Structure formats: structure tokens, C-alpha cells
């Protein structure tokens, strides 16, 4: 007999190779694996071993063998009956399938969104054809794949006496909606640093204060190193941290709030002791109040001889900021940012407010937060400064930021050091995003990169569709409809006028408007032209801008168009009041609308006998037409409105002059034109309704 391998022997006797190897080892015969050759002597020994085992079968084994024989006989008989036997089997299978399809009708079904006819039939345990018949009886022509709305689903289910419950499914694509609404267990919440923004008028010492705090309180490990500017930084006071946003104060409120982000916990309002309350101070107060954050007043420049802190306190009481010493609840801290005096006291007050407000977050979850700054770097790609507001962000986390996505490749803290984790209220600069996000975008970390990518792409697509069919902000045209639907309980207004008296008169008159269920709230007033800052505040607060004898500048117009902010311009106070009141009562029906078609800057003036003053102009925007109405604007204030008398290019009369061309203009019955004036051309267009 020739030699045989282990696996061949195992196959021959229907035994596993492993069993053969084990048996050989028990017999003290060494084999390495299933490919080992077995000689005749070893094969004989194995045969003897297995023959002895086969000769002593148990009763159970005998019964099993007999059963197998009987089964095999039955099977062989069945194979002979080819025709009728197979038919019987098919009938048995069909009966079995019918039995499986008979599903008990449930007492209750749940669904989310919509269901197709097929899905509803499956849930109800009915045939789709039966559901289609019922729909037909209701006058609805439907196919098996047609979507049914909630009312139709409830109607069909009630016909079978089945209760319907709609599941509320959280759409992770819209993660902003549930970031703020997530209920955290009290035990999971830990104390977090306060996020502080410094605001105030130009040259009142905001930047100096930031530098003073940074130079005196940054961590010692930074000394001698290169500080990386990431738009935010942390300082440590009495073993507690405070996060400062090193961004233009108003941007921290407006741009971010316009995108639904609330990043600031405390506002430091810097007011110069020698200068008092100025226009931008008032603007800052209105921004902070609109955001609903506590205000600490830092009375700066106390080292100057003309410093008068009592005057500052007195002026701020007019804006409901009453010092604690006078029975109010606003903290006032006298400081000198340039000399570093009072800084420690200011920081202690921040900690005190933080302690009272109890700022907390849950660090044991995936991170959520807001973009502070973002830019494109040639070497690193998209870079974003993120403020973690809840949870902990880690290197390697898949992340969705606004409409962008990626994985956190690297994180750098405020002192330029690489870090692996960032907890609540910590600012970090990250790389790894596919595109540059926008300041104020919300972000969320996810467990799965595939999921993050899918959500990021869906959000980008959604944003594109929203941009195409963009719905405007609150406007007078749809105001009454929104009031009727209960969407509007309060109308936010921003009032700008040419003089303070007009501002006060306009504001007082608007506040007197009395329409049931709706009240007027004036969030900001000011003197002078309507600026971009006014438009951004209006966008963030969903407000309407009312201008009396003032005009928006070019940037304000552009921003108003992009942000869909409604600007209403008037020259008579009672008409402005009438328009707002009519809108609130649903009686607004203007027939014509003014459309500004161009602007020209007066570069030079010429006085000509019997003609008057000729304005040598340069068209800066749009076009000036012969039949358009014009108004003269000086320093943002309208000083005259009338009609064009002549419009010339060189010596020729022309119908219109386009942008970037020079022209000569005379205005009917008006000669007081000066260099630097802006001539604005407008036409009246019929409003389509």
C-alpha cells in the first residue's frame, strides 16, 4: 500500500484532519500538519483504532443510523414520484406562504413624516390593493409607491379602528435646532469659564484694555514664545479661567447672532472717563441688550486730569445702566488700561458675575460650538478658530462646521501650542475642513466620519437651495399676515434721523401705536446716515429700519439687499407713523415704490449767469437719467429733493449717464450745491401685488 497524507485519510473516512492529528498524538505518533505523509504501518494502526470504535456503537447511535436509513428510503421513493409529488409540495408551500402572510391587525401604528401606500399596508397588515381601493372610495387616485400625508394615514387607520402616533425624529442635518435644546443631567454639568467680549466707542481704549489683560495675565509658559493670534484667548485668575473674544466687539454680536449663534456670556462696556457716552457706546449697549447678556462697565482713562466717572454714571442711567452705589445692579469698575490700574478688580468682577450666573457645560459628550474666525492658508488649507461651547473636541474627531465638514487634523490653542483636547469655553484653531466656514457658523462633532460627510454635504445642498429661494426678513408687506398667523408679537424697529429732536419725536410717536396683541420695540436709535452696522443689527434682530431725512450709504444698501432687510425712508414723520400702523392693521396698500437708480459725486461746481450752479459730477453707482427725481445728500443727510434741470456730457444734452462717467448737472430751482455732495437719482415704480 502506498503512502497517504493525513487529509487524504481523513477525507476517505469522512473525519476531520484535526481529529486524525489528535488521534495520532494519543498514539505517540508525531505529525506536524494535515500534509504529513502516513506510511502503511501508521495507516494500519489508525484502521484498527477506528474499527474498534465502530464495533461498539451505542443504542442511540444505532437508532440514529436506523432513522437515517429510513429517511433515505423515503427520499428515494419520493424521487421516483416526479409529477404529482412536486405538485403537492408546491401546494403545501403556497398554503404555507398564505398562512405567513396573514398578519394580525395591530392596535396602534407609528410613523414619521410620510408613508407610501405599500408601507401603510404593511404596517396595517393589509394588502396594498385593499388600501388603494379605500383611497379610491375617498376620491384619491393612488399607486403603491405614492406618499400619503398625516391626515390621509389617520383617515385610513381610523377606518380599521387603529390608533396612529407620529414619531418626532430629530433631523441631524439641522443640528443647530437641538444643540441648544438638549437636556443635560444636572450631575453631568461642570463649571466652565465665562466668555467675555469687550465693546465701546472708538478710541475709548478697547484694544489697550485687551492688551493690558493679555500682557499681565497670560500663562507664564508663553513668555519668550511667538504668540499666535487666533481671535480669542484665555487668562487665569485665582485658579479660574476667563475666555476673551479678541474680535471687533460688534461683530461678536451682529454677524454671529444673525446666524443664530450666542457666544458671549458677559459684555465689558468700555467708556472713557474724559469723554463720556458716545454714539457707538449707545450702539454697543443696544447690541448687548438685544443679545440679553450682563454688562460690566469699565470706566477707562482714569489717569487723565479731565476724568469724570460720575458724569459717565449719570449718562449711562439714561440707558438703564444704574450703578450699584446708586441702587442699581450694574457693576462699574474704574480702570486705567494704559497703566494697568484696576485690571485685577475688573477680572474679579467678571469672576463674580460668572459665579452668580453659573455658566456650566457637559464635557463628557461630542463637542458643539461656534466659529469665531476662519481663513484660507496657502500651506494648511482651511483654518477655523472654534469656540467649544459644550462637550470636548479631540484631534481626529469627524466634524461638521456650517456647510463644511472634515476631520480635526490638528488643534492649536491661544498661545500657539498644539493640543489634543479642548473642553467647554476653550478657543482652538483647527485644520482639516474641506472648505472655509463663515464666522458665526455652528459646529458639531460626530462619532462617524461617513456620517459627518453625509450631513455636511446635505447641509451644503440645503444652503444652496435656500439661497435660490431665499425668504426675506420681516417687511411691512408681509407684516399683517405674520401678525394674523401669530408669528409676530413684537415689531423690532431701528430709527435713524437727521437730528436728535426728530429721532426722539419719531421714537415717541412709534411707541404710541396701539394695535391689539402687537407692540412696537425700538432696539436702536441714532443721528446720521443709515450705516452697514445698522443693517447688520436689523438682520440679527429681524428689525425694520426707518430713516427720517437720512439715506443709507452704499455699503448699507448692498448689505440690506444681501440680508433682505426692509428699509423705509420718509421725509414727513406722520407718514412714517401711518405706514407702520397701517401695516400692523393690515391696511398697507402702497401703489408706487421708490427705486434708487444711481449716485453721482459732485467733484467741482461752476456758477454761470442766468443758469445757476452747474455741478461737475462723477457717477459712482448705477446711472443718472434725465427724467429721474434727484436728492442732494450732504454728510448722510438729505438737504434737498427735486427734479433735474439739465444733464450734459461735455456740451451735449444726454438722456442718461452711466457709472464711471463724468457729467454736468443743474437742478431745478436749487443752486446751493457744494463739492463732496452726493446727488442720488431715483424713479417711482408701480408695486406689483
Swiss-Prot record:
Disulfide bonds: none annotated. Residues 70-107 are annotated as: Disordered. Residues 225-229 are annotated as: G2. Keywords: Cytoplasm, GTP-binding, Initiation factor, Nucleotide-binding, Protein biosynthesis. One of its GO terms (molecular function) is translation initiation factor activity. Residues 71-84 have a biased composition (Basic residues). This is Translation initiation factor IF-2. GTP binds at residues 200-207, 246-250, 300-303. Residues 300-303 are annotated as: G4. One of the essential components for the initiation of protein synthesis. Protects formylmethionyl-tRNA from spontaneous hydrolysis and promotes its binding to the 30S ribosomal subunits. Also involved in the hydrolysis of GTP during the formation of the 70S ribosomal complex. Belongs to the TRAFAC class translation factor GTPase superfamily. Classic translation factor GTPase family. IF-2 subfamily. Residues 336-338 are annotated as: G5. It holds the Pfam family IF-2. Residues 246-249 are annotated as: G3. Residues 200-207 are annotated as: G1. It is found in: Cytoplasm.
Amino acid at each position: 500500500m502506498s503512502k497517504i497524507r493525513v487529509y487524504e485519510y481523513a477525507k476517505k473516512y469522512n473525519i476531520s484532519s484535526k481529529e486524525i492529528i489528535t488521534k495520532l498524538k494519543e498514539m505517540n505518533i508525531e505529525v506536524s500538519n494535515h500534509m504529513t505523509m502516513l506510511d502503511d504501518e501508521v495507516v494500519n494502526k489508525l484502521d484498527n483504532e477506528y474499527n474498534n470504535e465502530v464495533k461498539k456503537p451505542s443504542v442511540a447511535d444505532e437508532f440514529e443510523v436506523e432513522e437515517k436509513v429510513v429517511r433515505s428510503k423515503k427520499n428515494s421513493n419520493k424521487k421516483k414520484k416526479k409529477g404529482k409529488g412536486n405538485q403537492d409540495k408546491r401546494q403545501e408551500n403556497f398554503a404555507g406562504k398564505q398562512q405567513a402572510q396573514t398578519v394580525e391587525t395591530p392596535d396602534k401604528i407609528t410613523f414619521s413624516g410620510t408613508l407610501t401606500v405599500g408601507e401603510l399596508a404593511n404596517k396595517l397588515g393589509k394588502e396594498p390593493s385593499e388600501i388603494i381601493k379605500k383611497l379610491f372610495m375617498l376620491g384619491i387616485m393612488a399607486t403603491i409607491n405614492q406618499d400619503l400625508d398625516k391626515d390621509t394615514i389617520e383617515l385610513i387607520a381610523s377606518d380599521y379602528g387603529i390608533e396612529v402616533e407620529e414619531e418626532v425624529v430629530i433631523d441631524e442635518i439641522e443640528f443647530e435646532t437641538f444643540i441648544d435644546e438638549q437636556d443635560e443631567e444636572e450631575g453631568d454639568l461642570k463649571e466652565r469659564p465665562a466668555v467675555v467680549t469687550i465693546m465701546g466707542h472708538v478710541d475709548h481704549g478697547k484694544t489697550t484694555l485687551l492688551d493690558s489683560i493679555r500682557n499681565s495675565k497670560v500663562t507664564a509658559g508663553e513668555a519668550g514664545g511667538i504668540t499666535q493670534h487666533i481671535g480669542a484667548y484665555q487668562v487665569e485668575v485665582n485658579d479660574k479661567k476667563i475666555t476673551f473674544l479678541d474680535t471687533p466687539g460688534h461683530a461678536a454680536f451682529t454677524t454671529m447672532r444673525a446666524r443664530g449663534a450666542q457666544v458671549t456670556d458677559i459684555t465689558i462696556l468700555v467708556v472713557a472717563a474724559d469723554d463720556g457716552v458716545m454714539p457707538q457706546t449707545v450702539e454697543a449697549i443696544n447690541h448687548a441688550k438685544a443679545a440679553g447678556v450682563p454688562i460690566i462697565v469699565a470706566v477707562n482713562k482714569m489717569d487723565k486730569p479731565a476724568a469724570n466717572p460720575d458724569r459717565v454714571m449719570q449718562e449711562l442711567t439714561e440707558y438703564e445702566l444704574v450703578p450699584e452705589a446708586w441702587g442699581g445692579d450694574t457693576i462699574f469698575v474704574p480702570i486705567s488700561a494704559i497703566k494697568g490700574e484696576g485690571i485685577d478688580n475688573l477680572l474679579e468682577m467678571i469672576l463674580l458675575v460668572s459665579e452668580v450666573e453659573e455658566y456650566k457645560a457637559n464635557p463628557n459628550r461630542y463637542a458643539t460650538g461656534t466659529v469665531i474666525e476662519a481663513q484660507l492658508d496657502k500651506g494648511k488649507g482651511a483654518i477655523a478658530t472654534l469656540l467649544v461651547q459644550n462637550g470636548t473636541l479631540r484631534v481626529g474627531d469627524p466634524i461638521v462646521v456650517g456647510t463644511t465638514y472634515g476631520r480635526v487634523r490638528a488643534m492649536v490653542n491661544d498661545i500657539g501650542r498644539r493640543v489634543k483636547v479642548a473642553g467647554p469655553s476653550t478657543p482652538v484653531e483647527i485644520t482639516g475642513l474641506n472648505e472655509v466656514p463663515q464666522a458665526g457658523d455652528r459646529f458639531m462633532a460626530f462619532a462617524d466620519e461617513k456620517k459627518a460627510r453625509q450631513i455636511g454635504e446635505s447641509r451644503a445642498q440645503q444652503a444652496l437651495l435656500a439661497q435660490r429661494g431665499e425668504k426675506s426678513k420681516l417687511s411691512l408687506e408681509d407684516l399683517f399676515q405674520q401678525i394674523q398667523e401669530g408669528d409676530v408679537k413684537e415689531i423690532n424697529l431701528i430709527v435713524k434721523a437727521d437730528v436728535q429732536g426728530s429721532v426722539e419725536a419719531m421714537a415717541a410717536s412709534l411707541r404710541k401705536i396701539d394695535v391689539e396683541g402687537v407692540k412696537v420695540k425700538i432696539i436702536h436709535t441714532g443721528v446720521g446716515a443709515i450705516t452697514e452696522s445698522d443693517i447688520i443689527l436689523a438682520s440679527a434682530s429681524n428689525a425694520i429700519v426707518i430713516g427720517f431725512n437720512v439715506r443709507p450709504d452704499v455699503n448699507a444698501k448692498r448689505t440690506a439687499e444681501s440680508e433682505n432687510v426692509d428699509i423705509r425712508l420718509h421725509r414727513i414723520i406722520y407718514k412714517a407713523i401711518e405706514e407702520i400702523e397701517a401695516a400692523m392693521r393690515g391696511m398697507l396698500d402702497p401703489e408706487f415704490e421708490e427705486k434708487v437708480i444711481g449716485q453721482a459725486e459732485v467733484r467741482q461746481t461752476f456758477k454761470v449767469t442766468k443758469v445757476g450752479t452747474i455741478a461737475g459730477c462723477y457717477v459712482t453707482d448705477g446711472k443718472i437719467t434725465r427724467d429721474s427725481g434727484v436728492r442732494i445728500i450732504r454728510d448722510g443727510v438729505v438737504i434737498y429733493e427735486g427734479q433735474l434741470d439739465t444733464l450734459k456730457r461735455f456740451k451735449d444734452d444726454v438722456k442718461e449717464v452711466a457709472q464711471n462717467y463724468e457729467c454736468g448737472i443743474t437742478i431745478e430751482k436749487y443752486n446751493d450745491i457744494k463739492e463732496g455732495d452726493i446727488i442720488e437719482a431715483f424713479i417711482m415704480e408701480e408695486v406689483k401685488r
